[in-house]
């Protein structure tokens, strides 16, 4: 099928595919409990209950690990916005609705587990963490909200294709964060979360592939738009750019990882450059996609140069941005108004 379909028509056409992949997801998902991966015996009361409040010396995580863990947590915290956006695009009926609710339930556990780990292990300032979490959820994640002016999803194919890349990127970020923690408990926790994210990615990736078979030109338009303007959902977090630099320089997630481990594998799975069913604007956009990839390659090269400059500067001056400094919220948070 190559005729243009409305979102409602596409939802109907893809319903059997969604039901098939939902059942596959349920059969592949391995149950796990977040509380099993929190070192509760390491915890102790804070001042309000007669204990001691947080001190920076109590954190056993590196600056990179602290920044990455907090960024991952506050990104997961914005689940109310993600649920709204996905529900608006995919609907709440039938297999689509069952998937939206199942996905939301699984994602909700990730934020709970990450917050428990950080607070129990005293890895970061819990007061600053709560201020940041409130701010991030208040800012939300929605096209045009708070005059952000950033692209998200305007159609069903926009939404499904975007999360195909985003879930894979999140899986890799979580897994690399676990390794950066240098703590076997954190590594196990992040491995469990990453496994969930991988199954989410597989679901969206394969539903997207079915969309390419049904409406190749529509899907190609979405693909070109997404890769040209891609941003991780945590872009609205205060000090995002500075935190992203720390995470990238630390090897958790950088432009090269994004291109080689996220973008290219998904494009290969969808056979974007081998397909022969693109016509008109779809064919033109597919050709232009090669230029988008070239731009991503250039971004990788520029990042490596910038990374080396920063490392040289830190070695020369002995100064580097600390996680504690980045997570201080004073003067950075202004609760957003709609």
Swiss-Prot record:
UniProt main location, coarse: other
Record keywords: Fatty acid biosynthesis, Fatty acid metabolism, Iron, Lipid biosynthesis, Lipid metabolism, Metal-binding, Oxidoreductase
Classification via SUPFAM superfamilies: Ferritin-like
EC number: 1.14.19.-
Single GO molecular function: stearoyl-[ACP] desaturase activity
Coiled coil: none
The keyword Transferase belongs to this UniProt entry's keyword annotation: no
Family named by the database record: Belongs to the fatty acid desaturase type 2 family.
Subunit architecture: Homodimer.
Function: May be a desaturase involved in mycobacterial fatty acid biosynthesis.
Note: Is a major B-cell antigen. Was identified as a high-confidence drug target.
UniProt name for this protein: Putative acyl-[acyl-carrier-protein] desaturase DesA1
Species of the source: Mycobacterium tuberculosis (strain ATCC 25618 / H37Rv)
């Amino acid at each position: 099928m190559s005729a243009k379909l409305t979102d409602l028509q596409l939802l109907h056409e893809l319903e059997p595919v969604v039901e098939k992949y939902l059942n596959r997801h349920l059969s592949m998902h391995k149950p796990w409990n977040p509380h099993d991966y929190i070192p509760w015996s390491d915890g102790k009361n804070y001042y309000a209950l007669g204990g001691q409040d947080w001190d920076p010396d109590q954190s056993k995580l590196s600056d990179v690990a602290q920044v990455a863990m907090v960024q991952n947590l506050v990104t997961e915290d914005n689940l109310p916005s993600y649920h709204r956006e996905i529900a608006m695009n995919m609907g709440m009926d039938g297999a689509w609705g069952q998937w939206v609710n199942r996905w939301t339930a699984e994602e909700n556990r990730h934020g709970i587990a990450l917050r428990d780990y950080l607070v129990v292990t005293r890895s970061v300032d819990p007061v600053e963490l709560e201020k940041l979490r409130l701010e991030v959820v208040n800012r939300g994640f929605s096209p045009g909200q708070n005059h952000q002016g950033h692209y998200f999803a305007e159609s069903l194919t926009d939404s499904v294709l975007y999360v195909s890349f985003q879930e894979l990127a999140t899986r890799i970020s979580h897994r690399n964060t676990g390794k950066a923690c240098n703590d076997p408990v954190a590594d196990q926790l992040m491995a469990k979360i990453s496994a969930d994210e991988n199954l989410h990615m597989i679901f969206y990736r394969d539903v997207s592939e079915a969309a390419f078979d049904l409406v190749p030109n529509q899907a190609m338009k979405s693909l070109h738009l997404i890769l040209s303007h891609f941003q991780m959902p945590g872009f609205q977090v205060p000090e995002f750019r500075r935190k992203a630099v720390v995470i990238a320089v630390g090897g958790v997630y950088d432009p090269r990882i994004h291109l080689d481990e996220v973008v290219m594998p998904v494009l290969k799975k969808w056979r974007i450059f081998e397909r022969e069913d693109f016509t008109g604007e779809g064919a033109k956009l597919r050709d232009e996609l090669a230029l988008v990839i070239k731009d991503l390659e250039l971004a990788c090269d520029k990042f490596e140069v910038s990374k080396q400059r920063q490392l040289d500067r830190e070695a020369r001056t002995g100064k580097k941005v600390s996680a504690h400094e980045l997570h201080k919220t004073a003067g950075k948070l202004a609760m957003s108004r709609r």
